[in-house]
Amino acid sequence: MNAKIVVLPGDGIGPEVTAEAVRVLEAVARRGGHALSFTERLMGGCSIDAHGTALTPEVLADCQAADAVLLGAVGGPKWDDPRAKVRPEQGLLGLRKGLGVFANLRPVRVHPSLLDSSPLRPEKLRGVDIMVIRELTGGLYFGQPKGRDVKDGHARAVDTLEYQDFEVRRVVELAFRIAKGRKKKVTSVDKANVLESSRLWRELATAIGQANPDVALDHMLVDTAAMRLVTSPATLDVVVTENMFGDILTDEASVLAGSMGMLPSASIGEQGPGLYEPIHGSAPDIAGKGIANPVGTVLSAALLLRHSLGLEPEAAAIERAVDQTITDGCRTADLGGKLSTRAMADEILKRLA
């Protein structure tokens, strides 16, 4: 297979972890006889410094023309002024919109060797294997009208929570397709006791559930879901929810694994390139020290192979190598170990079958 991958290292530790993920992808490609080409481009704070914008039209066009996009991280204190007109995160939102991705997939699996690394008791974590699917293009983050003004002498801010039926259907249908390859259970999270948009969401999810009787569907209010994630996470399989709820719940779920550096994500649409990135931030406090955990980015590369290139054996090989590396006791600083970013990737490469 020939494939073009755009790499957006971004800010902070982004360049360090993406470099190791590219090494792993190159190794897998050599073994499988695939020709993967990698092109690096600027996005985020580094792009603001160089071009005055977080995402240039040229970089977006390159990403749209690629087979997949691998992202490191964006943002940092240098650009962290909420009053700024240009912020690194705008690049990420623009990229998602430009690529047409509508669903963010975040697998959360607790490795048996890392049960003691989580703030939760080990007995609550055994068997945790969750796929959280977050809708990406609707809701409060994109609804209009949006803005600030003065009304009756008082400052006012407005955000709009809006969903159209097709936006809900496509992400819930994706959740059911994914569930059929797992434990055949979907939990749809909403706030239908208060929000009209959540009532529409629940109605549509119910209809999709009726059309897929082989998959169990249950509805859960978002506050209950937040509690379930820390009281009995092993009871959850595929969780699907709207944009802001998903943003919050996925960050909560990330602590289950013991370190945010362990977890990958994939943002996919109906067609076109997917966007793959670790869930952690730019971690400016450790940037340049060579101690960041590359596992989340390496596992994001595995998702890239699976969802954008259709290379399931190669994706599974990376995941097995990561599992064995963790089982063998290899750890970066976030997990109480001493391995550098490069050394951790070296250990993964040694175990690639």
From Swiss-Prot:
Site feature: Important for catalysis: 141, 191
* Cofactor comment text: Binds 1 Mg(2+) or Mn(2+) ion per subunit.
Catalytic activity, as annotated: (2R,3S)-3-isopropylmalate + NAD(+) = 4-methyl-2-oxopentanoate + CO2 + NADH
Protein's name according to its UniProt entry:
3-isopropylmalate dehydrogenase
This entry carries the following GO cellular component terms, namely:
cytosol
Q: Name the source's superkingdom.
A: Bacteria
Entry-linked PANTHER family: 3-ISOPROPYLMALATE DEHYDROGENASE
Do you know which HAMAP family this protein is assigned to? LeuB_type1
The entry assigns this protein to a family as follows: Belongs to the isocitrate and isopropylmalate dehydrogenases family. LeuB type 1 subfamily.
MF terms (GO), sorted A to Z: 3-isopropylmalate dehydrogenase activity; magnesium ion binding; NAD binding
Which residues does NAD(+) bind? 76-89, 281-293
UniProt organism field:
Anaeromyxobacter dehalogenans (strain 2CP-C)
EC number(s) per entry: 1.1.1.85
Where it sits in the cell: the answer is: Cytoplasm
The alphabetical list of record keywords is: Amino-acid biosynthesis, Branched-chain amino acid biosynthesis, Cytoplasm, Leucine biosynthesis, Magnesium, Manganese, Metal-binding, NAD, Oxidoreductase
**Cofactor(s) recorded in Swiss-Prot or TrEMBL:** Mg(2+); Mn(2+)
